Amino acid sequence: MNIKEAYFKCINKMIKDEFRGYDPYDGASSSYAIIQKYYYPRLFSAYFNKFSPFNFRPIFGIRQTMQNQTIGFSGLALINYYEQHKKYIEFIADRLVESSLIDRYGYHSWDLHGFPIQMRNLLQEVGMTDIGNGIIGSFFLELYKRNPNERYKDICISVRNYFLNEFLVKNKNIIFFKYTPATQDYNWCYNASTIVAAYCVLVSKYFNINFDKDSIQKAFTDVISRQKPQGEWWYSLNMNTGYEKPQIDFHQGFILDTLLDYMECVEYNERFLNSYKKGLEFYYNKQFLPNGQSIYRYPKKYPVNIQNQAQGIITFTRAAAAGFGHHYFDFAKTIAEWTIKNMQDPGGYFYYLRYPLFTNKIQYIRWSDASMVYALAIYLNYAGLSEKAP
């Protein structure tokens, strides 16, 4: 099937399923009391279900859910077919307004998953990350551009203010945005910081709101300062111990996209442009094979993670659209076609992980489907194919 058909096959299944599905991190959401109450059963369920190649969730009493981050991502994809999918877009907007935590926190923000996430040393009851809230905020910004409802504008600005007032950190002459409100002020996650900084710039510029340009720019330049000589970024830095986590994957694309957001919105200065080009070349040459298959975590080749595939489509399409070379759009097409051929189920959904001899075919609606429909929508929009369904 072609790219447009693949997009509609997936989004139509998501609509049919009412945007409900499983998640890699939903293992602690069991309906069984022993898992809900006790640490070790909860930890076992969380990690067993996350890493099992087979879906045992029904046995563990884990239900499919509608997650706020999923519908926010899905809404961003559906907006490319606004008139056709207006009913579902309005449903998503209303659902997100209803589930906002503004009464609790004073700002529009969301529990992104709707279930607890058990880590080895932490039970996260409310999943409120800057990345997920940035996705939802971006959905309302794009929705406002098509439907200038003051309620949507207020939400966009409220999310921006939440980030600026509760996430911004100044530590050891470094400025960054935290991953969550509870994140320690010494844990600096590079991609999370630039995602928030870019959102604040986009909203401030669009609604003509004054903002601290110097702090936002420094949040970007401080991340640029962590770029490695070849062009890659690692994942995070513990500013107390100096330990830098050496993880190179789809988060490289997150940083590149947000650098592009800043440059398109503010200025193409030489430092930003050189960093972007160097990072883009690394992403293109080192994190993907010529056939469109992504590298799991550079230099580790397998498994193929659907998030890597989706992000590659987004980042290379955007690079081409910004004038950095049509070959990037050609490569986005190569990635999309490889993914559709090798990681899309005949039923429409996308697979989670692909190994040389085995594929994890569990359907994860947030991690896999929402990411891919958004990526394909970005591609189709630039290709001029987002006017109507096939």
Residue ranges and their predicted role:
Residues 1-390:
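Glycan-recognition and catalytic cores of secretory/periplasmic carbohydrate-active enzymes
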